[in-house]
Amino acid sequence: MALLTVNLNVVSAEESLFSGSIKSLQITGSEGELGIMPGHAPLLTSLKPGMALITKKDGSEEVIYLSGGMLEVQPNNVTVLADIATRAADLDEQAALEAKQRAEENMNANGADVDFAVAAAQLARAVAQLRVIQATSKHN
């Protein structure tokens, strides 16, 4: 008999954002987009900033922004350990736009005190937040 659902836990250092049975999970891994469904092969990978699209057992969807982290897939359990995780509805578009602008300014600064890698990571997180906001506004 085929598995119809898998248990998912999404946690950050601050809180547990989701725990329950799901039909599928779409998430951004270090090598690209991943689709996790019941019966998926075991997997351990790092996550890039982006969206976790959860399709619950009843077919409804929930979207969570992840700043990065780790994904572990086992036969009956999927665990997302996020650096920072925020429900899409709680994201602030204006704050994300401002963070994007600050990161771009830092990347364009020519001073010796500019850490390009930090600025690039900040830009990636801000852009990922904006993509999550845009994707969820299309769903609603």
Swiss-Prot record:
Task: Check the record and name the Gene3D superfamilies matching this protein.
Answer: ATP synthase delta/epsilon subunit, C-terminal domain, F0F1 ATP synthase delta/epsilon subunit, N-terminal
Task: Please tell me one Gene Ontology term that the record gives under cellular component.
Answer: proton-transporting ATP synthase complex
Q: How does it sit in the membrane?
A: Peripheral membrane protein
* Keyword terms: ATP synthesis, Cell inner membrane, Cell membrane, CF(1), Hydrogen ion transport, Ion transport, Membrane, Transport
Q: Where in the cell is it found?
A: Cell inner membrane
Q: What is its main location?
A: membrane
InterPro entries given in the database record: ATP_F1_dsu/esu_C_sf (IPR036794), ATP_synth_F1_dsu/esu (IPR001469), ATP_synth_F1_dsu/esu_N (IPR020546), ATP_synth_F1_esu_C (IPR020547), ATPsynth_dsu/esu_N (IPR036771)
- Ribosomal protein keyword on record: no
Q: Which GO terms describe its molecular function?
A: ATP binding; proton-transporting ATP synthase activity, rotational mechanism
Quaternary structure and partners: F-type ATPases have 2 components, CF(1) - the catalytic core - and CF(0) - the membrane proton channel. CF(1) has five subunits: alpha(3), beta(3), gamma(1), delta(1), epsilon(1). CF(0) has three main subunits: a, b and c.
Regarding protein family, the annotation reads:
Belongs to the ATPase epsilon chain family.
Which NCBIfam families does the record match to this protein? ATP_synt_epsi, PRK00571.1-4
Function (record text): Produces ATP from ADP in the presence of a proton gradient across the membrane.
What name does the UniProt record give this protein?
ATP synthase epsilon chain
Q: Which organism is it from?
A: Colwellia maris
Q: Mind giving the lineage of the organism this protein is from?
A: Bacteria, Pseudomonadati, Pseudomonadota, Gammaproteobacteria, Alteromonadales
What is the name of the gene encoding this protein? atpC
